[in-house]
Amino acid sequence: MSLQLGVIGTGAIGQDHIRRCSQTLQGCRVVAVTDIDPQQAARVLAGLTLEAEVYPDGHALIQAPEVQALLVTSWGPSHEEFVLAAIAAGKPVFCEKPLAVTAAGCRRIVEAEIAQGRRLVQVGFMRPYDAGYQALKAVVDSGRIGEPLMLHCAHRNPRVGENYKTDMAITDTLIHELDVLRWLLADDYVSVQVLFPRKTGKAHAQLRDPQIVLLETARGTRIDVEIFVNCQYGYDIQCEVVGESGIARLPEPPQVQLRSAASLSSAILMDWKERFIAAYDVELQAFVDGVRAGRVGGPSAWDGLAAAVAADACIEAQQSGAIVPISLPQRPALYA
């Protein structure tokens, strides 16, 4: 029997997930939606020729008896409220990032889930579901390159809008690396420093771009991440793990190699959706399959908290220029 989903928020990512659950994934169907603009929700359903109930608000949808599990894809500051309500109702919930806009909010969610005594929350960090990252982790975990000593990473976007501010390089961009690199190494961060190279002339006046984030883990691995959101040439994600006896590199997305006019070339993607579209499919299918099997896996509320704590330290490091410690409380048994 199909898992009956309710979706809170029908903006761009909400629409994409509704389409995905209705047309691509197996074992689920969207039976209820809500949005701050009910007419927007109705338009999304009509555009997908989908029959589902439009509820006046997220709380009404969460309490709806036909809704068995939730997708929270609304405005970021509303996530904590709806995730806590879903936990209180005992319903599994997939929450797009951020889990909450503050580390304190993430802690409240962790505490509520612990009080329930079981995992109900999966956070929408999709990179661990990317085939390239999974292959890279398999090499790291196998020991073929020895212990990881250093990571060299980059997160580059062709350009960003005028509303993109310096701290968003952490909260909107680096947040993906903060999650996936911790997963890749199975290691927590202990400190961070942020450096600002010469500013690109392509950035608007209020944005300092590029940035270099230097992280250290509990086991002593050093990580440098270049954040360059006005690189012009494409959407480019790089990750190289330097081990004791070898180097492992994240594979490039498969593209046709072209030999023509005395040159050898292959295309670079321009959009993050193209780069990770398969990972989005896999992560949501994993959520659906897990709930149907009576469990929730994937990135947890604890992982959401870890990313938020690290992000707060990164922003402090942006502002101070100092090396800032990153301190997580002891991991609760629920997330062991």
Curated annotation (Swiss-Prot):
Coiled coil: none annotated. GO terms for biological process: inositol catabolic process. Transmembrane segments: none annotated. It comes from the Bacteria. GO terms for molecular function: inositol 2-dehydrogenase (NAD+) activity; nucleotide binding. It catalyses: myo-inositol + NAD(+) = scyllo-inosose + NADH + H(+). SUPFAM superfamilies: Glyceraldehyde-3-phosphate dehydrogenase-like, C-terminal domain, NAD(P)-binding Rossmann-fold domains. Its EC number is 1.1.1.18. The keyword Lyase does not apply. The keyword NAD applies. Keywords: NAD, Oxidoreductase. InterPro entries: Gfo-Idh-MocA_inositol_DH (IPR050424), Gfo/Idh/MocA-like_OxRdtase_C (IPR004104), Gfo/Idh/MocA-like_OxRdtase_N (IPR000683), MI/DCI_dehydrogenase (IPR023794), NAD(P)-bd_dom_sf (IPR036291). It is an enzyme of class 1 (oxidoreductase). Homotetramer. Belongs to the Gfo/Idh/MocA family. Involved in the oxidation of myo-inositol (MI) to 2-keto-myo-inositol (2KMI or 2-inosose). This is Inositol 2-dehydrogenase. The gene is iolG.
